[in-house]
Amino acid sequence: MSDSLRTTNYNDFSVYKDNLLPPAAYFVPFSTAQDALESDPVTARYSSDRVTCLSGDWRFRYYAKESNLPADLDAIAAEMDTVSVPSTWQHTGYEEPYYVNARYPFAPKPPQIPADCPVGVYVKKFEIENTALHHTITFLGVAGSLDLFCNDRYVGYSEGSHNTAAFDLTSYLHAGVNRVAVVNHKWCNGTYMECQDMFRENGIFRDVLLRSHGAFCLEDYVVHTDYADGKYTLSLDLSLGSGSGQVKATLLQEGREVAAQRVENAAGTAHLNFGALEVEPWSAETPVLYDLLLELTGTEGTREAVCRPVGFRHIEIRGNVFYLNDQPIKLLGVNHHDSHPVRGYAMTLWDMERDVQVTKQFNVNCVRTSHYPPDPAFLDLCDRYGLYVVDEADIETHGCQVEMHRPGALSHNPKWRGHFWDRVERMFCRDRNHPCITMWSLGNESHGYKNQDYCYQELKKRTTVPVHYEAVVRTRRWCYDVISEMYPWHNRVHMVAEGKGALPKYYKAPYFLCEYAHAMGMGAGDLEPYVQDFYRGDNMLGGCIWEFCDHAAYHADGPVHYTYGGDHGENKHDSNFCTDGLFFP
């Protein structure tokens, strides 16, 4: 008997995830060490013999109203279109592009959403040859929510558009052709946490990956690169699934073995300690990376190999100065959205690499991932090219302030605590092994501070990397690990840089402008005095210009090529306020 496609998860505040695998680091396994070593970490998902990228043609059906969604998938199977995944509804003709800045796309009354919101159904068939293996499916990005079905059986649910969602499909599959379906609601309760200044889009906008593995496999890995007395040490904590076997870990530089460790009878978890190493540190100026090769051999005979980059860097705040590798640093950054005029959210790896290359060419050394975690490949590129990253959780509730005049409606409400922490935890667990991560950010313009305090306390139990959140500056707490402001006047920045004239609290921690020099029109023409002040005092950490590029929807035909808010018949919009980038779309 088929499970009904019509679940209530998207509108059930108590459910923000269901049957998800625990959050874990991003990696791509191979069956041999040689294949793993020869792979490119950025493109490995497309070349692995243990991972099938399910991106490409999917069957799709769009419903303007959820009430029109049938319960049975077979009832619509013959009436479905073919769409390319990754993509969004707004760039494939199902809905018009829609831009709004700090408001919700509907009248806000959290956690309620419009009951009869649009919904899309995606279907993909694939073949399974070996049912003795375990199989997991991973969605790197789905906006706004997803209910997953496999062979007409309900599997689980996820929200948090820019967070990775992974499910175990093993018990749902059979030999031969299998079918997965994704019911993608336009809005969910979690939409209240995604009120970012951008075009609002929907759909499966990042890659979908199917992994096959034995019982003894790598489920997660955590890299610890501790620093003391001028030396770096390396240790690993591995999660290994069921079964038992041998684990070998090798650190290499350009193919040369630097160190190796082995555990013979590992089961469940394994800890490997390499001790002190002679290694070169990673920084934006010298992004030195090593290869970490993990080889697993199960007692049942299965083999698996993973190769991931590792960088050694040490971050520390002493007083009000931010140090990296024992040197004060300046973050000369930009805010970066996933934005493409043709593909919208669905950026290709080439799009990401182009953006990273451009930032480096213009002497930018930092990116704030405004306002959500990027595709993990973007972080691999930042590791490789050398960019400091402020990795930001997929949290913004700006509309609570602008429309409801209750800025703390979510952040002060303990009922939302689990929703907040889920998004922060999933970002942290996926991205914590990247040397480019220079700060964690708890989100943007979501007021503060009760739920942010909880997230901060939980993060500090797990990491020594500093934690950022701008809005706490307007509370009695004042700051977490750095003082962060957006768009302050020159005179205030100058007083902080000079070490006198500002209130004493401005000097208690490193001072960072998470947004400044709003690049609309001539808005970025006042960079020089800001940058001069960044170099006036060691307490000045720097800042990130708002923002990297204009947002627009491109049309090859028609009277104009680029359109903005209000150009698509929408009543509620924010016009061309999205043309605020350093570069054209």
Segments (PLM) and residue ranges:
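Accessory beta-strand-rich segments of carbohydrate-active enzymes
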Residues: 2-21, 40, 44-45, 59-63, ...
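Substrate-binding/catalytic cleft of secreted carbohydrate-active enzymes
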Residues: 357-358, 366-584
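Beta-sandwich strand segments
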Residues: 67-72, 190-198, 301-306
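Accessory carbohydrate-binding/adhesion or oligomerization-edge regions at the termini
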Residues: 1-101, 181-183, 254, 531, ...
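Extended acidic/polar, glycine-enriched regions
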Residues: 171-177, 239-316
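Intrinsic-disorder/low-complexity, polar/charged segments enriched in Ser/Thr/Lys/Arg/Asp/Glu/Gln
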Residues: 53, 119-125, 134-136, 164, ...
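Active-site-adjacent substrate/metal-binding segments within catalytic domains
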Residues: 91-127, 133-139, 143-150, 156-159, ...
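Surface beta-strand/loop "capping" patches
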Residues: 214-242
